[in-house]
Each structure stands twice: as structure tokens, then as C-alpha cells.
């Protein structure tokens, strides 16, 4: 959601803040602003709309400052107007705050502050914070005056938040605090940074320290001090990220999304190299997979429950199919936002898997935390077993759950998930292989077939990209004015139909729905006519003939049919008006391939419509509020 950056050091703060905000644009925003300190004065510059509007304002000013904070806002409280943009200031314009999150008790705090004479200039929940801190500052600056004022203020805040604070009376300090919202500190040479996410500081340093819940820190030109909310000094050591600045550049692609679609074969290849044992054979006495998960996590499982949101939920649906059909473990998949308020009965020997690409999705974290709390203290069979699947092991998820499958997809900038979705699918394939081996639920020769098929996927993915993109780009010209799409799939490819529909609606703003192909006659068929294209995933296997039959029902209603299917299937060629060919593979492995043409179709339709593919309206890459 919102993005925070902060800097203190010898360089010009304004440009570093603006460059950091540019790296956080992918999180989604509707306004932006920075605040800097120079010669005892606080300067705040804000702008509605795109970050370039702020850049143009800043360029008109001669800002000489070595400490500052910046923010991209995604509106939650108050309209997306300049007066609601961050940073927010106290009544004397001496103190500025940026915040990511939601202050749940802000109305109560605002009423109290107004009764004491404070004047508010925005509709936001954030503005209560600078007023609270200002009240708690000593009249004369003291050694720990700002730090202590922030510490006391956060005790009055309810909700999830990350904040950064600067004050004209404390020109050599930048204070940050975290509670249920991400914040990371970067360590440079005589300079220090803070940000909501690491891409903002990767150009300057790879030494980072993610703050944990209930922690605050003081950044000065000489170092970083970390404290808990009770004021106790903590010993913390930064870690080194295995990233570099090139990973967050477009590298010649028009959009990050297209670049990330093309990175998918490499993501799958890296995942296989990291987790699939090259020396495994059918007769080997060891598992084909090395996930480094303790036996206690997976032994005697009777049930698996998956919690996730959005695209990660679709990955969970594919995971459910694999875990039930191959590993033979009953599995449920729930939206994390629903799980929290209607949790299922506690069942013994249950593994709970949280799936989130960012590791910061608020609903998923809250669902996992609730599951942890309601099982703690119960007898052995009901003890919590938690596993996370994420692209960011250093995230809040990595601190919450004891075990992680790192999808190793690298930073994803485009708001619409592509390579991280495929990486999540790979995590479920690998987990399924591990459980199948342990439980002996699958014949070894069948396991060998799946392992061989997985190893062939990267080359097959590259084949699709090389052979299909130009055709799909040309095909997209037929649909740039289309108002509705239907996506159909069955079995393990039903979630891919859902994902294809989600991608299209996210970035092209075209209404699209995904359905199980067998459900067409139970309602969706009423929507069909010559103006509603139907995209159908038809892969040879257990439901191939059924899917083609369902597609014929759509043809009878004059719908234009687009088929994701192998090229050499004669019956499919006669059924569909347009083919998006994919190699014929084992039906269980097909989702990795069938999703690629759907990603490309969504991308090219959106690009043809002249839309901002990487930053679609109203969406955020990392949804850090409930």
C-alpha cells in the first residue's frame, strides 16, 4: 500500500527521497510528498497524482537538506487530494510524520486533540500522530526528547502502522517505529535509510535490518539505535540482501510486467536447481526434494489448510488439487480475510500454510497469527504447525512462522503478479513431491514422471514465449474495446481460468470472470453472445473431452472461442476460433504453461488500450492494511 522512505547522511536528501519513492511506485499510490530539514526549518512539498507532479514541484525549489522523509499515499481515510497527502505536520510546522497503515482509534484521538486546541488540516488518520508527538516533546530539546515523545505516542495508537518522524528541533535525528506494518532500515557508509520495502534502498546499500513489531529506532549520521516500545535498547545485526540494483530495472522491456513474464522460465529453473535433487533416481533411498523442513512439521498430517488472498489464493487452489490428488491429504483453501472471522473447527495434525508474495499481506498475517494463538497450549495433536510460502523470507511472514519455502523469484515490480504466481505453484509442486515421498502415497515411477516433467518446464515455457507473444499482441487488437470476457477451465486448470480473468480485469479494466467449464450451463451461459469472447483451457487429460463439449455450448451462442491447448489436437482446432498453443505435458504440470498465454493476452490488451500496466488504478502491490 503506502510507501515510506527516509534518509539521513551527507548526500542531498531530496533527490534520494524522490528516487526511493520511484522505486516504491509499484506499491500503488494516488499522491506523494517529502519533508526535509535545513538550518532549523522544516520544508514540506506534496502533490496529487503521479510522482512526476511532485518531482516538478521539488525541482522548482533549491532544497539543501541532509535529512528527510518521503511518502506515496494510497487513500484509506480521506480523498486523494493534496491536503490529505503525507507528510503531515503539527500545528507549529516543526514536526513531520509519514505513515503506512491504519490508526483505528484516530477519531477518538482527534476529538481529544481538537478539544485541547489542535487544528487539523486534513481528513486522514495519520495527522493525529504529529500532534500527539508535539504534545509530548519537552519545551527545550533534550538528548532523548524526540525519541521518548515518539515512544510515548505509539502507545496511544491502535491499529497497524509504520511511521517515520523528523523534527526541526532535532535536525540530526530520524525516528521510525513499526507495529504490524513493514519497515526496513538500510545501513550505508556514514548514511542511513528507511523504507517500506527494500527496492527503495537497494541502489545505496544491501545491508538491511527489518524492524519487528513493537520496535522503534533512532537514525543519526553516526549510527542506528533500536529500542522496544518499553524503551529498552536492543542489540540488532543487519543482514545482507542477495539483490542488486539491476534487478529493479526494466532492462529494455516496455513494462516491468512483460519483463517479469519473460523471467518466469528462469524462476522455475532456479527453483528446481535449489530444491530438486539432481542425483535422485527412482531407486534412490531419499526424497527427490530438499526443502529443509523438519519431520515434525509434516509427519502424520491429516489435514492441510491454506490461507491466502488474490493471486496467491489461486495458487493455493492449484496446491489443493496437487496435495489431494497426489499426496492424498484433505486440503482446504480459504481467503485469509474470511478465515479470520469464520475459522474452521480445530482438527488434529493440521498444517496451516500462508501464501503471500510480499510476506506482508495484512489479512494473511492476521489469519496465521490467529491460528497460532488459538492452538497454543493445546495437546500435541492440536499444536500449531505453520508454514509460509513467500518471495520475501525477510518479511513479516518470515518472523511470524517458523518455517518458510522461499520461492526465490526475485523482486517483482509490476502490481499484477506473474512470476511470483508461477513460483508459488512451484512451491506447491515441490511440497507435494516431498509429502508424497514421505507418505508413500504415490508410486515411485509416477513420482519420477513428475520430476522429469518439472525439469522440462523451463524450456517449454521459453518455447511459448518465443512462439506466441507476437501472435497474442496482434490478437489483442481485436479486443481492446471488448467489455466482457469469460475464462473456462476444469480440474487443475480451473484456478488458472480464475487467474486469467483476474489478470485481465486488474490491468485492462475489462470485466472478466472465471468459471469451471462444467458450470457454464448453470448460469454464466446467459451472458454469452457475439460480443463476449470465451477463453477456454483445454489440456489433454481427464477432462479434455468435457471441456471441448463445454466450449461447443459457448459456440452455439455465437461467442468467439479462444483455446489454450496443444497445437496438434485436431478436435481443438475445429472447436476454437483462435488457438494459443502450449506444449502437451502431464495434466498435473500444465498450469505452469497454460497461465503464460493468459498473462500475455491480458498484458497486450491493456497495453493496446494505453493503460498503465505496471501501476493499475486503485491497486497496490503489497496490501498491508485489512
Curated annotation (Swiss-Prot):
Keywords, ordered alphabetically: Aminotransferase, Cytoplasm, Glutamine amidotransferase, Repeat, Transferase
One Gene Ontology term of the molecular function aspect: carbohydrate derivative binding
Enzyme kind, highest EC tier: transferase
Swiss-Prot/TrEMBL GO biological process terms: carbohydrate metabolic process; fructose 6-phosphate metabolic process; protein N-linked glycosylation; UDP-N-acetylglucosamine metabolic process
Active site: 2 (nucleophile), 621 (for fru-6p isomerization activity)
Subcellular location: Cytoplasm
Keyword Cytoplasm: yes
Subunit structure as annotated in this protein's UniProt entry: Homodimer.
Function as written in the Swiss-Prot or TrEMBL entry: Catalyzes the first step in hexosamine metabolism, converting fructose-6P into glucosamine-6P using glutamine as a nitrogen source.
PANTHER family hit by this protein: GLUCOSAMINE--FRUCTOSE-6-PHOSPHATE AMINOTRANSFERASE, ISOMERIZING, GLUTAMINE--FRUCTOSE-6-PHOSPHATE TRANSAMINASE (ISOMERIZING)
Protein name: Glutamine--fructose-6-phosphate aminotransferase [isomerizing]
Organism field: Thermosynechococcus vestitus (strain NIES-2133 / IAM M-273 / BP-1)
Gene name per UniProt: glmS
Amino acid at each position: 500500500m503506502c510507501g515510506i522512505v527516509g534518509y539521513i547522511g551527507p548526500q542531498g536528501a531530496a533527490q534520494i527521497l524522490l528516487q526511493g519513492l520511484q522505486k516504491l511506485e509499484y506499491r500503488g499510490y494516488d499522491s506523494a510528498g517529502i519533508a526535509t530539514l535545513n538550518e532549523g526549518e522544516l520544508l514540506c512539498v506534496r502533490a496529487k497524482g503521479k510522482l512526476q507532479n511532485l518531482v516538478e514541484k521539488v525541482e522548482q525549489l533549491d532544497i539543501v537538506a541532509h535529512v528527510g522523509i518521503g511518502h506515496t499515499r494510497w487513500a484509506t481515510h480521506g480523498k486523494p487530494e493534496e491536503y490529505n497527502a503525507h507528510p503531515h505536520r503539527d500545528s507549529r510546522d516543526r514536526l513531520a510524520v509519514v505513515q503506512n497503515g491504519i490508526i483505528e482509534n484516530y477519531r477518538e484521538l482527534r476529538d481529544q486533540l481538537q478539544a485541547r486546541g489542535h487544528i487539523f488540516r486534513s481528513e486522514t488518520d495519520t495527522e493525529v500522530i504529529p500532534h500527539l508527538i508535539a504534545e509530548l516533546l519537552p519545551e527545550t530539546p533534550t538528548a532523548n526528547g524526540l525519541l521518548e515523545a515518539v515512544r510515548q505516542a505509539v502507545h496511544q495508537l491502535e491499529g497497524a502502522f509504520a511511521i517515520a518522524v523528523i523534527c526541526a528541533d532535532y535536525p540530526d535525528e530520524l525516528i521510525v517505529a513499526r507495529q504490524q506494518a513493514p519497515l526496513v532500515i538500510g545501513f550505508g557508509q556514514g548514511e542511513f535509510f528507511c523504507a517500506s520495502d527494500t527496492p527503495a534502498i537497494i541502489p545505496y546499500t544491501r545491508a538491511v535490518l527489518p524492524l519487528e513489531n513493537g520496535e522503534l529506532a533512532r537514525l543519526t549520521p553516526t549510527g542506528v539505535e533500536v529500542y522496544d516500545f518499553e524503551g529498552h535498547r536492543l542489540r540488532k545485526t543487519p543482514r545482507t540482501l542477495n539483490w542488486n540494483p539491476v534487478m529493479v530495472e526494466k532492462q529494455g522491456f516496455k513494462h516491468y510486467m512483460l519483463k517479469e513474464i519473460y523471467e518466469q522460465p528462469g524462476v522455475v529453473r532456479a527453483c528446481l536447481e535449489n530444491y530438486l535433487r539432481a542425483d535422485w533416481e527412482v531407486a534412490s533411498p531419499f526424497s527427490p526434494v530438499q526443502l529443509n523442513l523438519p519431520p515434525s512439521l509434516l509427519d502424520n498430517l491429516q489435514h492441510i489448510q491454506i490461507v491466502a488472498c488474490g493471486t496467491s489464493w489461486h495458487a493455493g487452489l492449484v496446491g489443493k488439487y496437487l496435495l489431494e490428488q497426489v499426496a492424498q491429504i484433505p486440503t482446504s483453501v480459504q481467503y485469509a480475510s474470511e478465515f479470520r472471522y469464520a475459522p474452521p473447527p480445530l482438527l488434529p495434525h493440521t498444517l496451516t500454510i500462508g501464501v503471500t508474495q510480499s510476506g506482508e499481506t495484512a489479512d494473511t498475517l492476521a489469519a496465521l497469527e490467529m491460528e497460532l494463538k488459538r492452538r497454543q497450549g493445546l495437546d500435541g495433536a492440536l499444536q500449531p504447525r505453520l508454514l509460509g510460502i513467500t518471495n520475501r523470507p525477510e518479511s513479516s511472514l518470515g518472523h511470524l512462522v517458523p518455517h518458510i519455502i522461499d520461492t526465490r523469484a526475485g523482486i517483482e515490480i509490476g502490481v499484477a503478479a506473474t512470476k511470483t504466481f508461477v513460483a508459488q505453484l512451484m512451491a506447491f509442486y515441490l511440497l507435494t513431491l516431498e509429502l508424497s515421498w514421505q507418505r508413500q502415497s504415490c508410486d515411485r515411477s509416477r513420482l519420477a514422471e513428475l520430476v522429469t516433467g518439472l525439469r522440462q518446464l523451463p524450456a517449454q515455457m521459453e518455447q511459448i514465449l518465443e512462439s506466441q507473444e507476437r501472435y497474442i499482441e496482434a490478437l489483442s487488437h481485436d479486443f481492446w474495446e471488448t467489455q466482457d470476457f469469460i475464462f473456462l477451465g476444469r480440474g487443475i486448470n480451473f484456478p488458472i481460468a480464475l487467474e486469467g480473468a483476474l489478470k485481465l480485469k486488474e490491468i485492462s479494466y475489462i470485466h472478466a470472470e472465471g468459471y469451471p467449464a462444467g458450470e457454464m450451463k448453470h448460469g454464466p451461459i446467459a451472458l454469452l453472445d457475439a460480443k463476449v469472447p470465451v477463453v477456454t483451457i483445454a489440456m489433454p487429460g481427464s477432462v479434455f473431452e468435457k471441456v471441448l463439449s463445454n466450449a461447443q455450448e459457448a459456440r452455439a451462442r455465437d461467442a468467439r472461442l479462444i483455446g489454450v491447448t496443444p497445437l496438434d489436437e485436431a478436435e481443438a482446432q475445429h472447436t476454437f476460433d483462435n488457438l494459443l498453443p502450449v506444449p502437451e505435458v502431464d495434466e498435473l504440470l500444465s498450469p505452469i504453461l497454460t497461465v503464460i498465454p493468459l498473462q500475455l493476452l491480458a498484458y497486450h490488451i491493456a497495453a493496446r488500450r494505453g493503460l498503465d500496466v505496471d501501476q493499475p488504478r486503485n491497486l497496490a502491490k503489497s496490501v498491508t492494511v485489512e
